[in-house]
Amino acid sequence: MFNQSRIGKYMRRSISLILVLSMVLLTGCGSKTYKAGKQLDIGVLPDLPVYGELGMAYDNAVIAQGEEIDAANYNGCYAAMLVDETTKDTIVAHNVHGKIYPASMTKIMTGILVMESIEKGDISLDDVVTLNRKVTFDDWDAMASDLVGGCSLTVKNLLYGLMITSYNDCGVILAELIAGSESAFCDMMNEKAKEIGATNTHFVNCHGLHDDDHYTTAYDLYLIIKEFSKHDLAYVIDSLDTYDFTYTDADGNEQVVTIEPTNEFLTGEVNFPDGYSIGSWKTGTTEEALNCLIMELKNDSTGEEYIALV
């Protein structure tokens, strides 16, 4: 959400996630110094059902309202979650149903709808979009590309720019392409959230810049990233450590900007435990949401899969 240097500072402070991962390695360590997001005081959520009409619980970990699991080391976090996706066992759960601001983790849902539109044939990765204006934001340091009116680029570059380096303007451009307006696209986001069981989530934009009425929960984000990971393209995008973001400027000249992921585990700036690989992921940073990261992990030896959120 913010400029790259601030995101880098956040990733270097992500000691808590390393310690969450180390729990998988059976060290049992934790940290009290990392806040994953800002909890909202807007009521108590009902218990989630043990299983639903579509058998949701058979595919997902189930955590009761207020249930804390091995959470003593995470009292300094507003939310923390670690799930063994192979067994559906919850290893860590702290405030997973408390409402939080998702920041750029919002873009996971945006990515879902874009990939669904591609798979349905409504749009193509190769479609070229020409901008009629520069997309601007009230937040002076909102992460955005250099695109202005008259620039053109492919849907692929818009999607990759959105998911890899968190360009907020790319989200707005894609939303308007698919739904005609960002507001209509948010209606689609909220409908999709309900469809997958993320019923304590409400989106009012496609990028995650702060709005008091834009919120989710750690558990809902768990459901959302699982939906995101159903798409093969998600893994292609999330595996990249660099990408050449390419567009044609208003004068007809090709411009190439090499972008890097906001996840510094991928760039190598933060060490990642040996023997594990990263699947889908998304970071988030705003003044109100503070710093967040959700990530899929795989034990390369056993094939066991995990989802971690801090």
Task: Name every feature range the model reports, one short phrase each.
Residues 1-40:
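Gram-positive cell-envelope targeting signals
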Residues 13-14, 108, 297-299:
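Hydrophobic alpha-helical segments, especially transmembrane helices
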Residues 21-23, 201, 277:
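Exposed boundary/loop context
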Residues 25, 82, 131, 297-299, ...:
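Hydrophobic side chains in beta-strands
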Residues 29-30, 198-199, 210-215, 219-310:
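Domain-terminus/edge residues, biased toward the C-terminal soluble/receptor-binding domains
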Residues 34-219, 228-229:
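Active-site-adjacent loops and short helices of periplasmic peptidoglycan-processing enzymes
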